[in-house]
């Protein structure tokens, strides 16, 4: 375990303290099979999915309106 901590410390020598602490907590949870570590990188992901879906729906609707008006006129 000491070798693991030494290797982790060597990798994160130039990065902020929070990155090292988060990584050590993740490694500890993996080694002990705990499910206590939560990801903070995925906070606004659902908002982006909805925005992309709405964008494509609007794009398809505009295409259908254009084709309809092209046929009618």
Curated annotation (Swiss-Prot):
<comment type="similarity">
    <text>Belongs to the orthopoxvirus OPG078 family.</text>
</comment>
<keyword id="KW-0946">Virion</keyword>
<feature type="transmembrane region" description="Helical">
    <location>
        <begin position="49"/>
        <end position="69"/>
    </location>
</feature>
<dbReference type="GO" id="GO:0055036">
    <property type="term" value="C:virion membrane"/>
</dbReference>
<keyword id="KW-0812">Transmembrane</keyword>
<keyword id="KW-0472">Membrane</keyword>
<dbReference type="GO" id="GO:0016020">
    <property type="term" value="C:membrane"/>
</dbReference>
<keyword id="KW-1133">Transmembrane helix</keyword>
<comment type="function">
    <text>Late protein which probably plays a role in virus entry into the host cell.</text>
</comment>
<keyword id="KW-0426">Late protein</keyword>
<dbReference type="Pfam" id="PF12575">
    <property type="entry name" value="Pox_EPC_I2-L1"/>
</dbReference>
<dbReference type="InterPro" id="IPR009175">
    <property type="entry name" value="Poxvirus_I2"/>
</dbReference>
<keyword id="KW-1162">Viral penetration into host cytoplasm</keyword>
<dbReference type="GO" id="GO:0046718">
    <property type="term" value="P:symbiont entry into host cell"/>
</dbReference>
<protein>
    <recommendedName>
        <fullName>Protein OPG078</fullName>
    </recommendedName>
</protein>
<keyword id="KW-1160">Virus entry into host cell</keyword>
